[in-house]
Amino acid sequence: IRPSRGLGDVYKRQSLMGSGDDVDWRRIFIVLGLTGIGLAVIVKLVLKEPVRGAMELNKGTEIKKPPFKESLKELIKIPAWWAMCFGIAFGSFVSYAKSAFQTKYLVTLDPSFDFQTLVIILGIMNGTTYAAGAFFGARLADKWGKRDVRAYGWLPAISIGLALPVALITWWVPSIEVHLVFATLFLLLIGIYLGPSFAIAQTLAPIHMRAMSTALFFFILNMIALGGGPTFAGWIMDLFKESYNELESVRYAMTVTSIFFIPSVISFLLVAKVLPRDWKAAEERNLKLAK
């Protein structure tokens, strides 16, 4: 290390997530996983749970927390809720894998592209385009859903269906600039399904089980998407490295991983099919609880 470098510069260049150097993907996932466990402990100790049903119940009314088994039995009876969970889980399976290996792919695609400029562009893209997709999707779902609640299933199915070919193109373009254009469109499309999915999770769950509904929803999402997406893509990538170079192995691995958008679309189409019945039942059930 040259004496002229400050400690901040050294750390910035050599840190696990901030350098352009090749770091084993397993090591990164282990570090992030351990950090997440630590954060979960802090959240458990610091955050307080709000009153259940406070938005719907009369002032002073409180609903007791049901046992886990009772909550699970109730949620099992709501097929649209489960279809939504697997729809967003398989959709996020692809998007999390893309996020995990996008920087590695771009550095391999064009090593001469300034790395700091690249990560700034990616940060702005993820912070604006993805958020815009989520906002637009929520507004459109609410507007369309007033006429037909099946829109909460149709809209995610359409957006993910459109995201599939965009995702495939994104990994096979010849330059970083073209990749970023299609990646921006991809982020916009996959952000759209967030609003409708969370609306379904909260609306269909009984008032006194919404915390349990959210917890189980995120458990399924994280186990399949966050736990499975990057790991699956990394495993497939290692297999392709036996026959292809670094760039091609990433391209083929992400092409295979993108196929998981198909079960996501199917799941959301199933949501649209059964949602009217489940939505009506949820409104009647919650009205009784509120009284």
Language-model regions: role of each:
Residues I1-Y11:
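Single conserved hydrophobic/aromatic residue that forms the stacking wall/gate
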Residues A134-V149, M237-D238:
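Helix-to-loop junctions at the C-terminal end of transmembrane segments
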Residues I78-F135, I190-L194, F198, A225-A233:
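Extracytoplasmic gate region of multi-pass secondary transporters
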Residues S15-G33, A151-W154, D238-F260:
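A membrane-interface helix-boundary motif in multi-pass transporters
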Residues L45-E70, W279-K288:
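Flexible cytoplasmic inter-helical loops of multi-pass small-molecule transporters
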Residues L34-E56, S267-A272:
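C-terminal membrane-cytosol helix-exit motif in multi-pass small-molecule transporters
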Residues F115-T117, I207-F217:
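Loop-to-transmembrane helix entry/capping segments in MFS-fold secondary transporters
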Residues V149-S197:
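C-terminal transmembrane helical hairpin of 12-TM major facilitator-type secondary transporters
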